[in-house]
Amino acid sequence: MHRTSVPRLLFLVGLFLLAPCGAFAAFDPSLLVGMKARSIGPAGMSGRVTSIAAVESNPNIVYIGAASGGVWKSVNGGVTWEPLFDDQPVASIGALAVFQANPDVVWVGTGEGNVRNSVSIGNGVYRSLDGGRTWTHLGLEKTERIHRVILHPTNPDVAWVAAMGQLWGENPERGVYKTEDGGKTWSRVLYVDPRTGAADLIIDPRNPNKLFAGMWQYRRWPWFFRSGGRGSGLWVTQDGGRTWNELTEADGLPPGDLGRIGLGISRSQPDIVYALVEAEKSVLLRSADGGKTWQSANKKPDVNPRPFYFGDIEVDPELPNRVYSLDYNVRVSDDSGANFKTLVSGSLIHGDFHAMWIDPKNPDTIYFGNDGGIGISRDRGRTAAFVTNLPLGQFYHVAVDMQQPYNIYGGLQDNGSWRGPNTVWQQGGIRSHEWLQIGGGDGFDTLPDLSDPNMAYALWQGGNLGRINVRTGEWRDIKPSPPDGVRLRFNWNAGVATDPFKPGTVYLGSQFLHKSSDRGETWATISPDLTSNNPEWQRQNETGGLTPDASGAENFTTIIAVAPSPLQEGVLWVGTDDGRLHVTRDGGKTWASLEKNVPGVPANTWIPHITPSRHDPASAFVVFDNHRRSDFAPYVYRTDDWGRTWKSLVTKDLRGYAHKLEQDPVKKDLLFLGTELGLWFSLDGGGRWMKWTHGVPTVPVMDLVIHPRDHDLVIGTHGRAVYVIDDIRPLRTMSEKTLAQPVHLYESGEVQQHWRGAEPGGFALGSSEYRGETEPYGAILTYSLNVPGLPLAEEEKERERELAERQARRQEPEQEPRTA
């Protein structure tokens, strides 16, 4: 299927050419190439960047790795960016390295090493020999996350990898690995135990056989995190990894158990080495003799904040006493680490820094990576610019309103909650200033009040809920207060919903389900505790390990999914993080427990989303997510009898643990599913799943919404912001019968004429400005041809692409019809 924009009253035509058999059961999803999703951003608030590598001979060529948004490249110092990893099996990037002797050679270690509660997964090491245009997978699939890749400076076949291993379990595929044949084979050269991985790795710039490794024992459970243990330590090799020596208290390390260790080495004086060590009393250590002995440089309480999430240090390539610490801000010390001051504030270019690249030939040039994206300094950090054209937003949820054009609402990791248009009726695309922030913190569900276009609700971590008037900016906190003597437990990403029948009615889940009938002014509790209430899973005040970190991210035994039926008032489905599933059919007066009716799901499995059917009030879809116990299988179920029996919809085609299922409101067997590894769809109620690859990269797809009026599929991703597939109606009527016809014209929607204004002045930012894709011009006509033996050659595809590009560049008319 090909869709091409045609000016004015001509039509935008979709075409797909079918295989001669025309069999619906053997339908090839690549034939839907014309129904390409469009990336709408936003990019003004980007997403977490975990690694940066640039070409030393030309630092304008820079690569960045995103926590769950793949690899990107700029050839002009960050003015524009190109994604390079969209068609690879995973999107989580932990490490990048450029072979400077031939900078077309780029290595990637997948799986983020900043092990927060929402981190994604990797599957080993990749290498490109052509600057990122193509990639080869080099193995180490089970390492799960890689925080550092070190390349031999002159031998392109030699590399070392710091593999952290599983976050939510134990496995032997962790430690330091080495290849001497370009990744064909690997040797594990440093290993401690199944609980300890390599969190950092540095190489002596004058002696490639000398490396230091920071080993880290760590583990997450759904309700707890522990950093540190006997496995953690600092190791050194003098022979490229064949033998290692562990440094001890006798060498100057802190006594007792250690945690994460961040490492830095001076390029100008390699005998000067730094180690930021998590311990009962964390410390920055410095060695002036190449790591033989270590002295304390800084023991201040704030020397190592939140090491599980930060903990990296860098040394100025010219000034061996200038040390950078990456944490909430970028801090710098000019006295060998004894005293730090804030250099780049998180309030300037966003906070929570994870990556840094310093130009070794001109250390004034620095690239920073943080939870908001990329910052660039050209004066050694005295000033910094923030890059606003990387659409790496990590959305948790999306919602839509009924405005014209409609708006999309959503919350992002560490980037608040926002509202923005799905398209704009002017030239120039959807730009950052079109988006309005309506909530802060880690944004989660952000819901419009469909009875009042000026009102919306924004949820952030810990069940904090606010109501905002988007016209006036008036804000009100409406989180329910606990009754006397009761402690409410709210998940980091609590369940919330509005009622489809009663305007102004809101539901919010703690361990109880709370209901407000007056937009949050007052609340009533309408359920008993719907969780297991297991006290062993309620020790969040003790979480963190060596460094306490009771942020609320490990809050457990809580409600995380609240789903009112759109068909029958009083029907509510509720899911919890400890695997409890309930339904009420009388508005909360009575509740039925359902989880024991679901076959094949491990006990206590997370229930992130429930989708009540839009065709039958007794039907619902539930996704279960057990990756927090190192089980990455998808679990997707359907009931048609109020939860008494359940059918699995998982087939061998699916990849990635499941996040959200969306059922089409018109064709009940048309299903869309978001998993950790992309967007999937089924035309037969889940009998066969196909990956949607047209415009949607490999990325965690967290939420899906079908717009009830415009028939668009809105896709909220955790790593690549928001995508929209315009007008999915052809998928509703597609069948063996229609595909067997020589020619079939599919239903087209109403068309609304509107003024397509010129690009507004006063906002232009040059080449660096991000412009989200708007909906296509004209009505959309979609037809299929069934011509036996008719090929769809690559040159035909290329001609279609060229035609679309030419027409997109044409001068647009003053008035254009629009799909309503």
For each predicted feature, which ranges?
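Bacterial N-terminal signal peptides that target proteins for export
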Residues: M1-F11, G346
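General helical secondary-structure elements
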Residues: T4, G34, G44, N123, ...
